[in-house]
Regions:
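Bacterial N-terminal signal peptides
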Residues: 6-16
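Positively charged n-region of N-terminal signal peptides that target proteins for export
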Residues: 1-4
């Protein structure tokens, strides 16, 4: 009996300690507490899904309260209507819903109204779900949603109604033909005549970020870099045995084990002396390895391209020619960011950076893209792999503060140690344009090879 009582006391004590630990963790990461958030050392752990949601939900509310009305005023839209159906959501939907929701529930009609006068935008969910209290709910049955919408539009009587349809911006083209038809029918001719594309409002909403989100993104990037560092090490790679596909699938599995999301399949390619670009198969001493890798964490996507060198017996560093190629890639990064300034367009930055790079003797290709809620996110691209003369429409959009971008590019460089073989050095790092216009790497950039022992 005494043993049973003692065991019971131990169990109760452990349960209490566990509950206390969970409570402490929840408090530590709650942005609603008004306290600064300390992110965990990514070498020890990542945030649990519960901890992530405790951060993301208040950010969504703050974005609505501090950003949306100004964006609606800038784009001249009084009311923004975003219908989504389960498994056929608008691309904007995920940025407006908590991590506890993986899809729209049945049909959800989100409505945003700008009251003017510097007041926050009003927000409504027409249907049966308030999305964890983010939205005041205009309750209605499935068959009555459009009738409830019409009553709300009559009440607010907006001059301009925005919907997400666009030829140029995939992020702002979420309304289906059926949903638009039903919307127009419900609004009636007078209100339907007020409809215009909300494409630039959708782009503006998706591209601008809060300072708190940037802090979180830096943590996410550290986690992504850590996975790459681990993959490009002898923990994963045994030269002469491990294949590039082995590394690819190790990275994919590692993402799952960490509880992270993914938005594209990782890649690991090989550059080797005397062979055509990107041979596949067993990794050997003397190979240069390249990876393209990204994760989804706290609702944010990352995108990174790094390079490693497999040492030959007796080597302690990569050949000078390979290091010079990496340095040339760093120079192209500098030039790209130098010419991508606030209120300049992506096409202007592309033309100027390419011109200066060629003057300096580089063989460049630039194809940067915004990043954030999507991997290839809303905002101005700087070229594309097949658009080195400029990107139509989207490339004429300007850079704005508090936005994030993947600086993605490559240079082709001659490597003397490889018999003057031309080698492509591809790099990609995520960076933010700060409020004053200065660029800031999210978590530094690669300027030296990962070294793998033979």
């Amino acid at each position: 009996m005494r043993i049973r009582i003692a065991l019971l006391l131990v169990v109760v004590s452990l349960a209490a300690a566990t509950a206390k630990a969970i409570a402490l963790r929840t408090s530590e990461y709650s942005s609603e507490s008004g306290q600064s958030i300390t992110y965990p050392d990514p070498t020890q752990r990542v945030l649990t899904h519960r901890e992530q949601n405790a951060l993301v939900t208040p950010w969504i509310k703050k974005r609505f309260d501090t950003l949306l009305a100004g964006l609606m005023t800038r784009e001249g839209i009084d009311m923004w209507i975003i219908p989504s159906r389960e498994y056929n959501e608008d691309p904007v939907f995920a940025s407006m819903s908590p991590l506890t929701y993986f899809a729209s529930r049945r049909r959800t009609i989100l409505v945003f109204s700008n009251p003017g006068g510097g007041k926050p935008a009003e927000r409504y969910s027409i249907g049966r779900f308030d999305y964890d209290g983010i939205y005041p709910m205009v309750a209605s049955t499935n068959d009555g949603q459009h009738e409830a919408l019409r009553k709300l539009v009559d009440e607010k009587n907006p001059k301009v109604i925005g919907i997400n349809e666009s030829d140029a911006w995939q992020h702002a083209d979420g309304i289906t033909a059926n949903e638009k038809r039903r919307l127009v029918e419900a609004l009636g001719p007078a209100h339907a005549a007020k409809i215009k594309s909300a494409e630039m409002l959708a782009v503006g909403w998706l591209e601008v970020k809060l300072p708190e989100e940037l802090d979180a993104y830096r943590h996410a990037m550290k986690v992504a870099h850590l996975v790459i560092r681990e993959a490009f090490s002898n923990k994963v790679i045994t030269p002469g045995t491990t294949t590039n596909e082995d590394v690819v699938w190790w990275m994919r599995q590692r993402v799952v084990e960490l509880g992270l999301g993914k938005w594209f399949q990782p890649s690991v390619t090989i550059w080797r002396q005397g062979e055509k670009a990107n041979p596949r198969g067993v990794i050997l001493p003397g190979d240069m390895l390249h990876t393209d890798f990204g994760i989804v964490y706290m609702g944010f996507s990352t995108d990174t391209q790094h390079n490693a060198y497999v040492l030959k017996p007796g080597e302690t560093d990569a050949p000078a020619g390979l290091k010079a190629g990496l340095k040339a890639g760093n120079r192209l990064q500098d030039l790209t960011m130098q010419y991508a300034r606030l209120e300049r367009t992506g096409n202007q930055a592309l033309a100027d950076a390419l011109a200066q790079a060629k003057k300096e003797g580089l063989v460049p290709s630039i194809y940067c893209h915004p990043i954030g809620y999507h991997g290839h996110a809303a905002g101005p691209p700087i070229g594309m792999t097949d658009y080195q003369q400029g990107v139509p429409v989207r490339g004429d959009y300007v850079f704005r503060p508090n936005t994030w971008h993947s600086i993605e590019l490559n240079v082709t460089h001659i490597v003397p140690e490889w018999g003057n073989q031309p080698v492509r050095f591809a790099l990609e790092e995520d960076a933010a344009i700060m409020p004053g216009g200065k660029w800031d790497w999210i978590d530094g950039r690669q300027d030296a090879f990962y070294l793998i022992k033979p």
